[in-house]
Each structure stands twice: as structure tokens, then as C-alpha cells.
Amino acid sequence: MSDTPQLVVHRDKELMAEAAAARLITKIVDAQSSRGSASVVLTGGRNGNGLLAALAASPARDAVDWSRLDLWWGDERFLPEGDPERNVTQAREALLDAVPLDPERVHAMPASDGPYGTDVEAAAAAYAEELAKAAAPENHATVPSFDVLLLGVGPDTHVASLFPEHPGVRETERMVIGVHGSPKPPPTRVSLTLPAIRTAREVWLLAAGEDKANAVAMALSGAGEIQAPAAGARGRARTLWLLDAAAASQLPRTMYPPASA
């Protein structure tokens, strides 16, 4: 497990999104070259969608073999299919509809008007089963080997739909949970848990804007994961925080090299 996070601070959110998109393209191409395919977990929110839009606008996107890419989600708002607030709907608009993905490899979380109806626990269990089916049986794993897992960091330090002091952030067994009573609407969601997040080779946390500065400082200053879920998001090989200058404004400059600014 990568316990020491790496920080990269960019001038503004636009540059951060472009740089993150370039990093992701390189990571996907490298994974496809070495293993034949790549697996990425997407995040929603303004920074996650900004990265996808930057990727869509990048000429280098054509280096990716989109037919050999598995896409998963870290969390989802439990709303009807096609609802504009669903992360998958926003991802399709930002990028997915513009690239030749294999539909069988786009693993959206269930919607509230799907086969499980409004039973969010059944929806979470179904997604956990889908993850398990895609896992390598020889590794006795319950989730696939994610090359990169993307997470946005909320102003309250939440990641995915794991909120401070809520039951979900305390989960230690299940890979996917139904979330009830989210402090951020809508109240019902599906989310990966910290144990699932920590199986990823690399976890990238995205934060931009002055409203994220306190959360970033809290998560990187030794806060516990129950109080600051972002502090508990770590990759097996690498944990990378991609920030803009505003989000990094409460960090001591000794935490990141001047060249990264």
C-alpha cells in the first residue's frame, strides 16, 4: 500500500484537468501495451467531469484503444436511468459518447428504475457481483485490478459517497454499499467502500478551488479516515493528489516541490 501520497499542484483548474487527462491517457496506453487492456474507475463532480472533457478535447485520445478499456464508477446517485444528475449521464456527455467504447465494458451502477427498483441494497449487491465476475479468479479477488481509480474530494473531505462520520466510511467488509441519508442530495446512493478503493494500483484524488482548500489540508495533515474519508483513499502502488493552486493554498509549500506549481 502506498502510504505516502504524491502531490502535483497546477496553476488553475483548467491546467489541472488537461494535465490529469494527459496522465490518464499515458496510463491507459501503458496498461494496454503491457496487459492488453486497462481498467479505470471514474468519478463524477466538476473535477471528474472536467478531466473527461479535457480528455475528449485532447488529440492524444486517439492513442487509446477504447474497445479495450473497462470503465467502472466509484459511486452513483440512485436516480432513474438518464437522469442528468447521474454520474454516468454526465460522463457520457463529457466523453463517453464521443469515443468508440465497447458497451459491454462500460459498467454503470444500477439506476433506481432498473431491475432492482428502489432497493438500493440490492443494487449495491448486484454491482459487487459484477465486480467479482470481472476479477481475476487466480488472485481470489472480489474486484478487478483497477489501473487507476479517480476520486473527487468534497469540501467536507468526502470521496465517492463516503461521508465523514457516516456508516459507509466505517465499512470494512463489503466492496459496494447502499448509502442512505447522504448529507449531499440526493440522499440515496451506491458507493464503493474504502476497502474496494484500496485495491486499485493507483488512486488519484482531484481537488480544485478555494472551497476545497480546508478539506485538502485536513486530509493531508494526519486526520483519520472516519473524520476525513479522503485521508483513507490510498492506492497499492501510488496515491496521487492532483490539485490547483487554490485547493493547495492551505498546505505548507514544503509538501510539494515548487516546480509542480
Question: Which residues does each predicted region cover?
Answer:
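N-terminal glycine-/serine-/threonine-rich phosphate-binding loop
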Residues: 1-40, 121
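Glycine-rich N-terminal segment of FAD-binding domains in flavoprotein oxidoreductases
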Residues: 29-59
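Glycine-rich beta-strand-to-loop/alpha-helix junction loops that act as flexible
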Residues: 42-47, 151-155, 208
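A glycine- and small-aliphatic-rich helix-loop capping segment at beta-alpha/alpha-beta transitions
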Residues: 54-65, 89, 164-173
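Short, conserved loop/helix-junction motifs that constitute active-site signature segments
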Residues: 61-70, 99-101, 168-170, 195-200, ...
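ATP/nucleoside-binding phosphotransfer catalytic cores, i.e., glycine-rich phosphate-binding loops
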Residues: 195, 201-261
